[in-house]
Amino acid sequence: MLAKLMSLFLLGIVRFLTGSQARWYGCPPKAEQRIYFANHQSHADMVLIWAALPEELRSITRPIAAKDYWTKTPLRQWITTAVFNAVYVDRQATPARPTAAVAAEPGGAPAAAAPADADTAMAGGPDPSPEAPPRPPSPEALRAALPESDPLAPLVRALESGDSIVIFPEGTRGHGDEPQPFKSGLFKLAQMFPQVVLVPAWINNVQRVMPKGEVVPVPILCSVTFGAPVQLEAGEERRPFLDRARRAVIALREV
């Protein structure tokens, strides 16, 4: 009950200070599992997106929150846990590198090399037929191979439970007009959860509400623009996908 009252109070404060306008282009608000990915300007980004979503989406969407910042005081931790149902991410954790075994086959086991035809080779005959290229790992294998120490592990658990999440692929707050290059987390999640809809979002003006280092918010009109979903194409490499996703976010700035 207390969390519900605090939710209504915070929603009123955020909308009073920012207007919290949500604009949907090519992607109507829909109760389906999604990964919303947006530019990152302020700690208030999480709060603004939460307030911009309609109630039926807020209840199934969990924003990520920097653990070191949002658990610094008991009040912050209670709000992010009880009100936002946030997913805490340890910014100091080191992402796990994929092993050769996982990259080789869906089951996580390395592909066995075909035995060489020694007699044919020694006789000067044709070499054995080359092996077929290893199949890409399945989403299930990728999730199973992710260690609990990986910073993506809490996000994977949230998605496995059916929740939608809000992430900021830059990994840290930007200071320019455009977001910084996206880190690999969005690509990995797209590989692990191909059925989840990836929705870009552009957050406008929130850095002026709560500039870095300030504790008192400044009233100013803000908006969140949601765009058409993007999808990881078959065989698409990490950097081309991340650059394309970043461009989808930037394009919403002009809508």
Regions picked out by a protein language model, each given a short descriptive name:
Residues A144-S149, P179-Q180, R238, L242:
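A conditional alpha-helix N-cap/helix-loop micro-motif detector
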Residues L75-W78, S164, T172-E236:
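A cross-family acyltransferase "interaction/gating" segment
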Residues H40-S42, E170-R173:
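Short glycine-rich anion-binding loops that position phosphate/pyrophosphate groups of nucleotides
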Residues P74-L75, S149-E160:
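Short, charged beta->alpha transition segments
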Residues T99-G108, R157, T225-F241, A245:
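A charged, well-structured terminal subsegment
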Residues I64, V87, V199-A201:
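Hydrophobic/aromatic beta-strand patches that form the interior of the parallel beta-sheet core
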